[in-house]
């Protein structure tokens, strides 16, 4: 009986540790999108969320972090009104020192219409995304993000 009780306690501790461990890469992913939001951009600590050799595949192109920041600047990202990402259906896989997360990302952006001054656009997207994270000194950081746009709707706001 005592062996069974000890087994149950150890089993629940292992599950609790696993839950906490799986939460760490998700916290990094959510932190990345929070840092990327227009309310916080440019985030002075973006390097807390990505590795030095970070790579993102977006819109059929490969970007380093510096290249992606330049792309955002070209899109006048600093003039955007709002950005919102809702992540769902996350699947986390862990190995020693690394994690992989696949998820659905639904984003909604409001920004000035570049072709019609004074007009704002609302863009709604759905992406299937995947990130590979590595553990650097006890902190997960995103090394690679793959983003495939499934749907995109742009409408003028009244």
Language model feature labels by segment:
Residues 57, 102-104, 143:
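Beta-strand residues in well-ordered beta-sheet regions across diverse protein folds
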Residues 2-49, 156-158:
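Short, low-complexity N-terminal intrinsically disordered segments enriched in polar/charged residues
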Residues 50, 105-107, 146-149:
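Short beta-strand segments enriched in hydrophobic/aromatic residues
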Residues 77-81, 107-122, 152-153:
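Short, cysteine-centered beta-strand-loop-beta hairpins and adjacent loop/turn segments enriched
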Residues 96-111, 126:
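A short hydrophobic beta-strand element
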Residues 84-87, 102-104, 122-129:
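Short, surface-exposed coil-to-beta transition loops
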Residues 43-95, 121:
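A solvent-exposed, acidic/Ser-Thr-rich amphipathic alpha-helical stretch
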Residues 100, 124-157:
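Short beta-strand edge/turn micro-motifs at domain boundaries
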